Amino acid sequence: MAKYNTGGNPTEDVSVNSRPFRVTGPNSSSGIQARKNLFNNQGNASPPAGPSNVPKFGSPKPPVAVKPSSEEKPDKEPKPPFLKPTGAGQRFGTPASLTTRDPEAKVGFLKPVGPKPINLPKEDSKPTFPWPPGNKPSLHSVNQDHDLKPLGPKSGPTPPTSENEQKQAFPKLTGVKGKFMSASQDLEPKPLFPKPAFGQKPPLSTENSHEDESPMKNVSSSKGSPAPLGVRSKSGPLKPAREDSENKDHAGEISSLPFPGVVLKPAASRGGPGLSKNGEEKKEDRKIDAAKNTFQSKINQEELASGTPPARFPKAPSKLTVGGPWGQSQEKEKGDKNSATPKQKPLPPLFTLGPPPPKPNRPPNVDLTKFHKTSSGNSTSKGQTSYSTTSLPPPPPSHPASQPPLPASHPSQPPVPSLPPRNIKPPFDLKSPVNEDNQDGVTHSDGAGNLDEEQDSEGETYEDIEASKEREKKREKEEKKRLELEKKEQKEKEKKEQEIKKKFKLTGPIQVIHLAKACCDVKGGKNELSFKQGEQIEIIRITDNPEGKWLGRTARGSYGYIKTTAVEIDYDSLKLKKDSLGAPSRPIEDDQEVYDDVAEQDDISSHSQSGSGGIFPPPPDDDIYDGIEEEDADDGFPAPPKQLDMGDEVYDDVDTSDFPVSSAEMSQGTNVGKAKTEEKDLKKLKKQEKEEKDFRKKFKYDGEIRVLYSTKVTTSITSKKWGTRDLQVKPGESLEVIQTTDDTKVLCRNEEGKYGYVLRSYLADNDGEIYDDIADGCIYDND
């Protein structure tokens, strides 16, 4: 509270405003003596509670933690050790006060030293000042006595330069603190407190009673436990108290430098990898304990001498609060380092992990046949993965037990939490019990390996399925194409069959009656079938064909007529086949339009009746006369006795399929002649119809065409040029007179059905005109 009391002291204001921060070694020592006297004078007086210096330093509010009782205020006396803590306040407050201070004053504190221990090194009043931004405690001010030190939580980060000794005396963790203390000791003969153990806090401080109760809490926090307030200064490298003497030797030089703060910034202050090992931690613990004991003893002595227990170190919480933004920035930097370092750190050595677990037993039921394809290529990689999975899990339980504080302060520890992500096998481990019912949790590695193979096999299976689908699609496409081709071929075949049926006058389905073997090579014609000797020929039809020919088909699908003499025929089998096909054969034979193969049918029937195939008879002559064929059949082909027993009467309507007797053949001969004439008549009729149309159109003839009489052309006709309407006639040709146009010519029609004019001179004498009306029955018999 001395700081508040000194608010009315003019000297204090002057000193504050003037800010004599740049003080060399000798000047600083004289200024310190003057301040000590002021502190003693003010310590006896009761200082007012209101903080007069606070607005000067720009501190928005006094430190919550440190409020010394009124009893303690008069008892406190300015002591050089108290000046050291001001250095601590400067260290913590420097970042915030850099803008307000003179460049000289800022020089010493441009860069805050790395993480700083929570515990203040000594009972100095100023170390307790928390530095809110812009709050600057002035050591030269009257407030700087031990009473001010309790107000230290407010302390601005920049103590006056006259107290450079004190600034330097303030310990930075162990190393930096030593440098400050050495500087103050050189400048002042006053004894400096040994550097307090890190994080030690006087139990008498009211606000931080929880920290004062156990200084070891700060020590433990400084070791590696993350600072609750985000101040990473605790985790900074802890330098043993031994180094204080060495740091003191260089402190004088540092204080004289224009920027002592730059020199005082050790790289180790922000935490270094040196503490990553357990051995180093133990050494640091020993050093901290020694410094703590020494510091605690001196604190007790001073308390007894001065009787001002509240003037002890500023409360650690004040430091923690003061170090807010700067400590957070350091935390971020360390966090970045820690986040980046695990990627660079290798896995822990094998000796720390211990021996790997024994290889699990092979599962009782394992079928590796489907994995043989990929087992050779993946055997090495799978072995490595299994080893990593078995060896990596043990470290997490071992490290927390042996090195609990390391994760917060050392970058070497973060790899441990990052290990589980590397061991990404949980989904496979979940599946592994299915294949390994009798295995322990240690066997997950083997299960994982097997599952890798299973995955490979599953992948292959999926690929096979996709390939099979593609194959099926291809097959479907090919099948569709094939079906389309078959349909086209079928259509073409049907179309061809229709043409063949129309061409060869086939009715009904095409059936093979007999298989014949070619006995010679035949070069077919327009409708004849060409084949080679020994080739099999299918007999399609043996009736309704030209004389001496059958309708056959080769293996190539060609249709045509074949001569019966060019193939070898088994008549016995043909007879049986014909009997089976008798029903469909009858309508063909009954068909009156086709009679060309009737003679052949007669010959075949006669040969089959003889029982011995014999030599197939030569085809009959084109000219067939009624009666002659009947006689030949009677003479050359006697009827079998069975047919004779049937009776003497012979009927003309007996079917040829029943192999009639010669009398039936005779009747068939007459039918053949009639059929041919009828066929000719049909052709003539068609031709005549066409000619008649032309005639009516050409001669504009309407009405019924009636033949008046018939006549013949004279044999003495001379050739002449015929007109467009003249009928070309031949000598002796018979004509039918249709109309008598005039005396010179008549309209006639010849046998071919053509019409035209014919001169009367070309016609023979027509005496018959007189007898046109005589009926056939009117025949005069002179006898």
UniProtKB/Swiss-Prot annotation:
Q: Where is this region: Interaction with SKAP1?
A: 348-448
Q: Which residue spans adopt a coiled-coil conformation according to this UniProt entry? A: 456-507
Give the disease entry from the UniProt record.
Thrombocytopenia 3: A form of thrombocytopenia, a hematologic disorder defined by a decrease in the number of platelets in circulating blood, resulting in the potential for increased bleeding and decreased ability for clotting. THC3 is an autosomal recessive form characterized by onset in infancy.
Keywords assigned by UniProt, alphabetized: Acetylation, Cell junction, Coiled coil, Cytoplasm, Disease variant, Nucleus, Phosphoprotein, Repeat, SH3 domain
Q: Does the keyword DNA repair apply?
A: no
User: Recorded GO terms, molecular function?
Assistant: lipid binding; signaling receptor binding
Give the protein's function.
Acts as an adapter protein of the FYN and LCP2 signaling cascades in T-cells. May play a role in linking T-cell signaling to remodeling of the actin cytoskeleton. Modulates the expression of IL2. Involved in platelet activation. Prevents the degradation of SKAP1 and SKAP2. May be involved in high affinity immunoglobulin epsilon receptor signaling in mast cells.
This chain's protein is named: FYN-binding protein 1
Annotated positions of the N6-acetyllysine modification: K3
Organism annotation = Homo sapiens (Human)
Q: Where is this motif: Nuclear localization signal?
A: 469-505, 674-700
A GO cellular component annotation here is: plasma membrane
Q: List compositional bias (Basic and acidic residues) regions by residue number.
A: 69-79, 240-252, 278-290, 466-501
Which segment of this protein is annotated as the motif SH2-binding?
462-465, 595-598, 625-628
